[in-house]
Design a protein with these regions (language model features):
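A gly/proline- and charged-residue-enriched helix-loop-helix capping module
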Residues: 128-148
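Short, low-complexity disordered leader/linker segments with a strong preference
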Residues: 1-42
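N-terminal secretory/targeting leader peptides
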Residues: 28-127, 151, 156-345
Length: 345
């Protein structure tokens, strides 16, 4: 019996030690210094999407460039599908804020699960194109984001781009708000989207994105919304016959770094991280825009029926959502509203 108890105690200690190691392994772990006295780092980064997405490709480019330019002094391991937070994207950004991991690519929608002000840029029908969205982020909007992220312990390394969010469903093409009535859509855990879909007569529900394919396959939900890259890389064409291109919400990507980690770096490493992050963002945006038309064609070839809303149809949705803009200005605050919400909405 004493021997058995000792083994159990040892196993318990080992389990606790492993948990501690895993918890600390994302915190900008350093591994001594080089011969010339520079600090070595082993960092971790997550993306919400899978390994065929432009998010992942850009993150891998960032990792490869860091390792190459530092001769292996800095390495970065990229994890797909929010693996470090068991698929929970909001928990993932909280890890970044708390320093349990080092970098992430996340949508502002996910940050809005922590602070709803971050969702302002994704408000419905405020941008006509991805170029309009990027222009807003290059100006006052980007600085407001940087300030608010800093308050939450995240250093902004710029923006990538997931694109305009589109709609898929099982039952019919969507042309008017009435076409949404009674349909159950999976949405991110984001109050704005919940109110938006209810206002349009749909039945919104939230769940981790990793569960969406199975829920669609089993008929537990009727549809979902996401950018084309995410729809394609998640193989939703296998379980969704209808795709509506309505460009209702612009979805940039926040490339964030734990701020304490960034502040702990020397100026040379800070400059290096900033420069290579900018390169990764530019690469991701280019790949995303270049690939979208081709991906839509491939979705059609796979059997999806695709319809695109006219300007008049978009105006009908915009008119139906006017109460949302009025209500959410109080949530977004003056800084975010001024930076992103057009006058008259």
């Amino acid at each position: 019996m004493p021997t058995t108890m000792t083994k159990r105690a040892v196993l318990g200690c080992l389990a606790a030690l492993m948990a501690l190691v895993l918890a600390l392994s994302g915190c900008g772990t350093n591994f001594g210094t080089t011969d010339d006295g520079k600090q070595r780092y082993r960092w971790k980064m997550t993306v919400t999407t899978g390994s065929t997405s432009t998010w992942y490709l850009a993150a891998e480019k960032f990792a490869a460039d860091l390792e190459k330019e530092t001769d292996g002094r800095i390495t970065l391991k990229v994890f797909v599908s929010e693996r470090l937070s068991a698929g929970e994207a909001t928990a993932g950004v909280e890890q970044l804020m708390d320093g349990a991991k080092d970098f992430s690519y996340n949508s502002p929608i996910i940050y809005a699960g922590v602070d709803p002000r971050f969702g302002t840029v994704t408000a419905p029908f405020i941008f006509d194109s991805v170029e309009d969205g990027q222009e807003a982020l290059a100006g006052e909007g980007g600085q407001v984001y940087a300030d608010y992220l800093s308050e939450r312990g995240v250093h902004l390394l710029g923006f990538g781009e997931s694109g305009m969010r589109q709609l898929t469903n099982t039952h019919r093409p969507i042309h008017t708000p009435e076409d949404l009535h009674g349909l159950k859509f999976r949405i991110p855990g984001f109050g704005l989207y919940t109110d938006l879909y209810r206002t349009l007569g749909a039945n919104p529900t939230t769940m981790p994105f990793g569960e969406v394919f199975t829920a669609l396959q089993q008929g537990a939900i009727d549809g979902q919304e996401n950018p084309i890259d995410v729809i394609y890389s998640s193989n939703l064409q296998e379980v969704q016959p209808y795709l509506t291109l309505w460009n209702y919400s612009y979805d940039p990507l926040v490339l964030g770094m734990n701020e304490k980690l960034f502040d702990s770096l020397g100026q040379e490493d800070q400059d290096l991280v900033g420069r290579l992050a900018a390169d990764a963002n530019e690469f991701q945006i280019q790949k995303n825009r270049e690939g979208e038309t081709k991906l839509i064609e491939e979705l059609e070839a796979a059997g999806m029926e695709v319809n695109e809303l006219s300007d008049a149809e978009k105006d009908e949705f915009r008119e139906a959502l006017k109460p949302i803009y009025s209500e959410y200005r109080k949530v977004w605050g003056d800084d975010m509203s001024r930076a992103f919400i057009p006058e008259g909405l």
